[in-house]
């Protein structure tokens, strides 16, 4: 999509919505009211997803690991999982408190049904999921990627078994249309027992080093079993290697038999060396799948180190992956020999005779690094490598002073913070074992300091001076331009950077979430770096901390008091003295604690608006509570899980996606209904919601209507359960397109039946 068209669509989208919203506010028609409420619901659901993944979960992660010192494995299955499920739990509480318990129960049933059918069904459409023994984490070759993913069969059986137990417990308790106090206690205790068991049986790597080491070990096994040689090698040439013959034809010696200098670069005429040029380009083309595979493995390692348990992917990581989606396609573009027709070289990259001028690359292959790329095919190279490593720095810097020509090296560019280093690409002229061992070391050292998927990719790709130099859009869609520092304005990056290319759905998501992201960026304090903490507070962070009492009060009570101004003044004075005495100490603790409180308040406010809007629809349009919970409420709360899990599957991090589909229902239903029911029954002093107050507290109960829509969805969940327990084993223990079609068809049929029953009021 061209830049003017992007700007035109963006401006038209926002201007038209502003006009329609203004018209809806000034008119009283049902259509305008429906449109206005629809916009409010969409933005509130977007707010729930963004604030949960980008604000609440990171703050909970920091608090659990840095303040309470809880391990990632425990926090991932408890605090972080609860934080991720907080929108659903809050929705259930607000619905029960508003007297529309059927809306809450319908949303929970609909959410479970949506995850088990639509989400898993679409996951099976993206890739065939095979349940095999001891295949919990797998790495994939270019040929098989996006086609077959493996998941440990024992983990699948465990997930289905726990889900079955949850289904029996919840179905038994809710079948009579009453939720007793003692049933709520049993639900919460059941969830706690299941969480403890899952924590003890958790087998996936939680540390970045563990994840990357496992990826490398599996890759080594695949290479050894299939006798695959790493194709990502070049035969680099130098001027000292070029010898003349009587015929005037020059020949080239391999890099491993010569000395190297990258201080100067000269041009080679590819027409004079057609066989060598063709061989070099052929080697590069063969190396493209290997480099893509390395990047995907590093992204999977990043995700496994940052997402533990049932946690959604952040909006920023989703946007970064969408921008680099070309990395996950099997179609690999290849290079051809340069010619006048292909325009592979620009005029600036040609010498006086029109031959390609290959220039050195800065900030990547330094003189000392060339020793790492010497071929170890003979003893001379090994001795040279040992001698070079032991030589002083100044000796080998002086040693390389002769002009050098590197046929397929990278054009020179200015040093910048966004320069992408080739050091993260598999080494060019080494054997498989050396490549993999060094790759593991370098990958662990570099990835530990990375803040985002964009950093992972940027540190794994070649960076070129111009977009039309040799490899433009061959490896990825990574932009060569600098990005804005504010993640909230990623839409601006897409509008101004032509090299970025995302799909229509992703573009629409940017348009919808950008206003919400900007509001959250300005309201909730955050740290840009995930690795460097206790940095000096910025002006924006100081303002956010000072204004936090006022924002919290407005989100919770909507009542303004002058005492809030005094409290903000006190906070400003304390921050001033803190800056004078201990400027950086406890900064991260303060930021993440305030961010956690503000995130909770934002969630509560957004859920309240959603419940009020849906309750208004129930009264105006005469729609049952259950059908709204099964459809609108479910779709709004589950769209984040759908996008996140599909993205996990596309990358190959299957264990998080499967765990979220089977673990989230356990969390939403058992803990959500149980905990919310306990809180409602203990807090209802008037008896408007809770019945049976004359008897023992254990017999206090909340009544709700079990209508035909709820029964219909329950039957759909049972059929989905039969698909997972019967059809999948009969289908050779895999979820392919046949199973996916069955699941998606089941959801469509059940939803259509519910809508039919609602319309005809059977």
From Swiss-Prot:
GO molecular function, one term: monoatomic cation transmembrane transporter activity
Protease keyword on record: no
Domain of life: Eukaryota
Keyword annotations: Glycoprotein, Ion transport, Membrane, Signal, Transmembrane, Transmembrane helix, Transport
Segments forming a coiled coil: none
Keyword Iron: no
Signal sequence region: 1-26
Gene Ontology biological process terms, A to Z: calcineurin-mediated signaling; intracellular calcium ion homeostasis; monoatomic cation transport
TM stretches of this protein: 31-51, 103-123, 157-177, 179-199, 502-522, 555-575, 590-610, 616-636, 651-671, 710-730, 739-759
Cytoplasmic side: 52-102, 178, 523-554, 611-615, 672-709, 760-762
Subcellular localization(s) per the UniProt record: Membrane
Function according to Swiss-Prot or TrEMBL: Putative cation exchanger.
Protein's name according to its UniProt entry: Putative cation exchanger YDL206W
Protein species of origin: Saccharomyces cerevisiae (strain ATCC 204508 / S288c) (Baker's yeast)
